[in-house]
Amino acid sequence: MCNTPTYCDLGKAAKDVFNKGYGFGMVKIDLRTKSCSGVEFSTSGHAYTDTGKASGNLETKYKICNYGLTFTQKWNTDNTLGTEISWENKLAEGLKLTLDTIFVPNTGKKSGKLKASYKRDCFSLGSNVDIDFSGPTIYGWAVLAFEGWLAGYQMSFDTAKSKLSQNNFALGYKAADFQLHTHVNDGTEFGGSIYQKVNEKIETSINLAWTAGSNNTRFGIAAKYKLDCRTSLSAKVNNASLIGLGYTQTLRPGVKLTLSALIDGKNFNAGGHKVGLGFELEA
């Protein structure tokens, strides 16, 4: 079955070149492990260098493959508890049903969503519904694929106000080493991206966005270069003269180090630059 992307994953390759390998202004640690009983644990914590504020989260996941069930529990330092139950590929091939709930013990606030997604060879569909008896918000998206071309639509409808609150379109093309993505959000925000895999070591990306009625055009270019199987360098720059640099090194299997820096090219001597440090551990 063809892996037709969801609407949010359109243009993902270009986004990854811009976003992965950076962690400006923070120290971050990620840990992932799996018990012998099949329970997956993942935890992360980060501290911002400018404010000193620290936060973290913990997630456990258990899969019952014979029944297509996945149970996920989440907790963060804001004392928010989350539970997610998903059922996949059993009622129909490519169909995934999910119940996602959030509970805040300090305030007693509860919220939840019912989610459904369906993927086949040439399309993918999805819908989320807020569990809110005062008037749920309905989210929906669809992506069609044909010979590398991708067309997508995303919407949200506020039933309490009987109003369409989101209305987005996207069009793109995907090949083995090249991707093009364009989108229009609510008829006012326009954007596009180009991803190119030059060879096995070099990936490049260009991003462009602007808003109707404004002269503020956002433009950026990014690149990633693999020095070897363990080391990679990343760099990006935008029209605001913000320069991002990243260095990723696999120290040993399951241990990855990331160093990054954000430089303000317009105020190079004034300071205000940001650095970041990240560790990823997997066992």
UniProtKB/Swiss-Prot annotation:
Keyword field: Acetylation, Ion transport, Isopeptide bond, Membrane, Mitochondrion, Mitochondrion outer membrane, NAD, Nucleotide-binding, Phosphoprotein, Porin, Transmembrane, Transmembrane beta strand, Transport, Ubl conjugation
GO terms for cellular component: membrane; mitochondrial outer membrane; pore complex
Catalysed reactions listed for this entry: chloride(in) = chloride(out); K(+)(in) = K(+)(out)
Modified residues (Phosphothreonine): T4
GO biological process terms on file: sperm mitochondrial sheath assembly; spermatogenesis
Entry-linked PROSITE patterns: EUKARYOTIC_PORIN
Transmembrane segments: 26-35, 39-47, 54-64, 69-76, 80-89, 95-104, 111-120, 123-130, 137-145, 150-158, 163-175, 178-185, 189-198, 202-211, 218-227, 231-238, 242-251, 254-263, 273-282
GO MF entries: nucleotide binding; porin activity; voltage-gated monoatomic anion channel activity
Binding annotation for NAD(+): L242, I243, G244, S260, A261, L262, I263, D264
Position of the Glycyl lysine isopeptide (Lys-Gly) (interchain with G-Cter in ubiquitin) cross-link: K53, K109, K110, K266
Entry-linked Pfam families: Porin_3
Subunit structure: Interacts with ARMC12 in a TBC1D21-dependent manner. Interacts with MISFA.
Family: Belongs to the eukaryotic mitochondrial porin family.
Protein known as: Non-selective voltage-gated ion channel VDAC3
Organism from which the protein derives: Bos taurus (Bovine)
